[in-house]
């Protein structure tokens, strides 16, 4: 399971409300918020699964 974050980071996120569960067991509201967190973590954050944790 993966998400393409190549176009991130983005300065602002629209609220898509498509939850993603990260490897930190945190639920991200959408791909934008998740991908921005991946960039901030220098790629250490990964996707556990789609949906809430």
From Swiss-Prot:
Family matches, as Pfam families: Kazal_1
GO CC entries: extracellular region
Keyword Amino-acid biosynthesis: no
Subcellular location: Secreted
PROSITE patterns: KAZAL_1, KAZAL_2
Name of the protein: Ovomucoid
Domain characteristics, as noted in the entry: Avian ovomucoid consists of three homologous, tandem Kazal family inhibitory domains.
GO molecular function, one term: serine-type endopeptidase inhibitor activity
Main subcellular localisation: secreted
Carbohydrate attachment residues: 42
Residue ranges annotated for the Kazal-like domain, each copy included: 3-53
Disulfide pairings: 5-35, 13-32, 21-53
Annotated site residues (Reactive bond 3) in this chain: 15-16
Keywords of the record: Disulfide bond, Glycoprotein, Protease inhibitor, Repeat, Secreted, Serine protease inhibitor
Entry superkingdom: Eukaryota
